[in-house]
Amino acid sequence: MTKLNEKEIELLRNGSSGSIATVLAKAVPGLSDSSRTITDYGQTLRGRNALILVDGVPMNLTRDTARGLSAIDPESIANIEVIRGSNAIYGGGAAGGIISITTKAAGGAPTAKTVVGLQTPLTNFRSDALSGDIHQYFTGSLNNLDYALDFGYQRIGSPYDASGHRVAPEPAQGDLFDANAYGIGGKIGYHIDDNQYLQFAANYYNAEQNSEYASDPNTKKYSAGTVPAKAIRGLKLKDQNKNENQIYNLTYNHKDLLGNKIDAQIYYRDFFTRFSPFDARANANRGKQVDQIYQENNVLGSRLTVTTPLEFLGDTSLVWGGDFSREKSKMPLDIFDPKVYDQSGGLEFVKIGNLIYLPELTTQSLGGFVQLKHRFNDQWSAEAGTRYEDSYAQIDSFVPLSQLGKTNPYTVSGGKVKADAWLYNANLTFSPTDQHSIYTSFNQGFQLPDVGVILRNAGNGFNLGSSFLEPVKVNNYELGWKGSFNNFSSSLAVFHSTSDLGAVQSFGNGLVLARTKEKVTGLEATLDYLDDANIWGTGGSITWMKGREKPQNSSNEQDMTGFRIPPLKLTAYISYNPTETWTNRLEATYFGSEDYRLNGVNSFGRYDVKSYTTADLITSFALNHNDTVTIGLENIFNRKYYPLYSQLMRSSDNTSHLLANGLTVKMSYSHKW
């Protein structure tokens, strides 16, 4: 488990261009590198998708948008907890683990805080490269009432690489270069009595791009990976990349209801996202159009967790409860005049109509769980539990875009796809001393596949009984050790996970879909040191994993793609805190080389990836009790490199071959009123 508090997050963001996804990639063992764009596609945890929670509300969707980490204002985050490995207690896609984000809390002494930030590349001083933000927070209590309010604005400029060239937009999954972002959130809590607490929270975040730049399509004529993506000016597109996220969350807590601790939650989420336009005229599944997809989702859910002490069994407790989620998704697309598009060299988009790529899809999940925890003595403890989950996906009959223009179009018959499963978990921990513990665990995870990506690419003869719609069930085995000695703390974990059917893989924009039998084996280790005076500290981590898959109707295994299994990752840092008011951190991250090709042939997610190292320097100084200045230098050695996502080229050509940011400075000033 990795925990980051508010102070650590604020510090690390200044060395990562403000990106939460990049902060986590540098700080969390087992997590792949970030894309440096709007998407967290390919940023797997232990080779599988992670469940992202914001105040307990899932950001994952059945029709996966891979935009969970960019759908919340980073300034509103108070702490992050990452649990690695599949989890039988949570449903909804926790196959690789859980990234749990908590926003700033209500209550306490009345406080107001203003934060102003400024960011610019140091390789090219231009007004369009300048980013800035301002945020305001209010928290406090009034009698039995707690409150919190935060709001802010951010202007996101354009990044520049180590040579001073503008980094091109990412056309496959999108980006938020040249964007405006607004966020507002609030919490109102009421102490009913000493044991009961009721809170309502609302959060709204809107980030929308407004750029004049596109990724030059002329780079496609060169062999993939041989030239960087190039930004060209002249884009004429009214509606660009966008994330709009609304969360409404009602929670109730009771510390002692007939001896039980109760945590209940009801939430509603409304999410809209828009992608970059795409020339899909060679793709029959999308109707052979120049198009732009957007997606609308709303989710209603609830969760109840009850903790019951079983004192008659000694130091024992029972955690039990259930959860419910109902999601509705639809995916329209706009179509553009192909002649105008061609005449402009792929820069001008004139809308001429719209179509439905994926009609309204309803998915529902109902789960119940029970977990028994028991401590035998000071050295031995164990827990075991089970979860039952019942899910379905439902859609009405529809004619897919693959049938557009055909004389006798095929209609996909509507209906329900049902799935249910019993999941189990067990954990045994031995602590020979207070400083050391050894554990072994078994956990199962469960999720529906990406039903939307299957249905929207349906062709002749497709039926809802397809094996592509069977659920993903993951078995995760882990053996680990945690310890501390003198001024050192360390951890070591070895894990192995298997699934008979992995997630649905889409190749060539849905022209080819595949599911494989998967197994992932890996190792994670950390080592940290802090001197007696709490002045000097150092540490690092190592992550290594290997993924193998066996395609359906094949007896041969092959390596999994780089979008699933990252190369060797090493992290290291040195901290120097000479006073209580001055903090300094130098950090470095290394990703190794890995050849993901099969028989030396490039294909989706399969390229010969080169190693890269990046380093950041961050310093934070408290001028007084109320004022703090933080300065971060990202990529301090101004290394020219391609992140993993860019080397794997999501678009399968050079338009996604984006260089990383060059030397960039981010400064922030905060004042408490």
Regions found by a protein language model. Give the residues of each.
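Flexible loop and strand-edge segments within Gram-negative outer membrane beta-barrel domains
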Residues: 158, 175-181, 195-249, 271-281, ...
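Transmembrane beta-barrel wall of Gram-negative outer-membrane proteins
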Residues: 126-157, 161, 165-212, 244-255, ...
